[in-house]
Amino acid sequence: MEKRPFLTEEQAQEIIQDVPTPFHVYDEKGIRENARRINKAFSWNKGFREYFAVKALPNPIILQILKEEGCGVDCSSLTELMLSEACGFTGSDIMFSSNQTPVEDMKKAYELGAYINLDDATRVDFLDRVAGIPENIFCRYNPGGTFQLGESEEGFQVMDKPGDAKYGMTEEQMIDSYKKLMAKGAKNFGIHAFLASNTISDAYYPELAGILF
């Protein structure tokens, strides 16, 4: 993978004259261009939307830039929900994916009208008890076993073991959860899955889609 720095050493030296170190420099042009590229790549899918993981870079300026480019945010904690709200995200702008979720976090996600993604079958009754069941709801799928891709063009081998992960539901749990959610008033259902970390190969996405659909 070619590394193309957006900042020259000379430019960095110039910035140092005015800004105390340490500091971070972000490429706004590059961020906007990449957001537009991914939106264009999936423009065939009317319902597509990119959700940026706030935990990756909880910087309000970056979040506002991505909001201007039509992106939503993926939150996993109360702090991330509050930050996203302060940046103007609300409702379907927010995907809330959390593990062992505290009551306050779940209530906040519900109050914001966020898409809530349940990672455990026991969370159905928990959500109903502490906040209520929204019309739109997601469940996280864990197919179990081992997930493996061949070596990528970059020379990386992608492998992880969803079967050892403590997050996500089996197919049977997914079906039971959807039935319970439907009985409690949910109307629209989504599927979420995260099968391997640090994947940089494009082959991951069609493989994952094949498992889900």
Language-model regions: role of each:
Residues 1-116, 121-135, 150, 175-189, ...:
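A charged N-terminal "starter" segment
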Residues 97, 138-140, 168:
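Residues in well-ordered beta-strands of folded domains
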Residues 100, 143-145:
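Short, flexible active-site-adjacent loop segments at beta-strand->alpha-helix junctions, enriched
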Residues 145-213:
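Active-site loop/helix belt of alpha/beta enzymes
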